[in-house]
Amino acid sequence: MKPYFRIEEYEWSHILKIFDKDDVKETLAEVLMSYPIPYPTITENTLYKEYMKLKGIKYPDLLVEDTWYTKMDTYTYDLTYGDKQIYFRRNNVGNASSNYFQVKNRWSVSGTVSPGPERTWNSKEFMTTLMGAMYSMKFTHMDEKILRTMIGIRKYICSQFKPNVAKCIYDYFKSENVLDFSMGWGDRLAGFYASHTGREYVGIDPRTINHEIYKLQKDYYETNTGFFEDGKTSRFICDAAEDVNLTQYSKYFDTIFTSPPYFDVERYSEESTQSWVRHKNLKDWNEKFLHVALENVWNTLKPNGHLLVNISDIYQRATGKDIPLGICDPMNDFLSKFSDSEYKGCIGMELAKRPNCRGIQTGTEHGQERLDEVFCEPIWIWRKTDGI
């Protein structure tokens, strides 16, 4: 196997002095398109070690009592849980336990505003603009790692949901039977198998190609169950959450935990079951996808069970300004109308100050980053009462 393309520091210094910038960008684009996409390298040994580390994480390791903020300061619903602000701090332990299986799949997806890695690598135009990052970011050399950084900042890479947060959620809520109606990249599946309390996981996702990979994950996790661990089972349903028939699971799950798509920010496939394909504006998406899906799965929740939804509002660029588009308040207003629902609060999930996935803007206050505070996405929490 030939070595991957690389430009040493002295070579790049020479290029900067001698050659025209636009010529360099175009030439680099052509050359790199003859190389494979620079996916992160995750070995089987790394997979095993990270999965074992994930099992060892306990929720007190990540759960922090401290103030945090979101990009929206105007939510109607309180951002506390148990009368205090708490959040899961950022930690990369366990990422490889799902990313080993899903990274190429994840890198095949594009965002609304920018192409993903796979689309970029197959377009001379996108590759040429990508090469501009060598200049704007003042890199001194080029290798696979630098290229991944360039893609992550200049283009679009769908981020993972932290498997360690999922594991901690399951253990914190003592979740046994779990429903996830938007499985995504299998990160919450990894967290489930690593959890102490989980027994059964049912996952729903309409993207057909994901399911063969979920099966690989399931087989690996079940093969690597320790002698003293209780066995776990999982089932995957390839369907749209708003359509799927869940009557067999009436009042069955003690926890529903998911992170749905953020309207059309990520376009996972062109399949007719995709919510962004079905609904072309946010109002329809809220009312005909998210709210219908929530009502559908609510019937599967046991009394005293919990629904947890990680979702955030999005921004639309218009006339030079970021216009907020509401998802969270309409969702919570909808859930509040159920006769057997009780809003319990919100737990934060810490993100980088400049999150790339989903094309979501950094949390800001009057356009300025709050650099001395912790930026989080909300995990909204509802409890199902006994209806009396």
Pin down the residues of each PLM region:
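Conserved proline-anchored active-site loop of SAM-dependent methyltransferases
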Residues: 166-172, 178-191, 203-205, 239-241, ...
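Conserved S-adenosyl-L-methionine
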Residues: 194-200
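Short alpha-helix immediately C-terminal to the canonical SAM-binding loop
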Residues: 209-214
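Mobile active-site "lid"/loop adjacent to the S-adenosyl-L-methionine
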Residues: 253-296, 314-322
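N-terminal accessory regions of S-adenosyl-L-methionine
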Residues: 1-159, 321-329, 344
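Class I S-adenosyl-L-methionine
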Residues: 321-388
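Glycine-centered, small-residue-biased loops immediately flanking beta-strands
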Residues: 305
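S-adenosyl-L-methionine
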Residues: 215-248
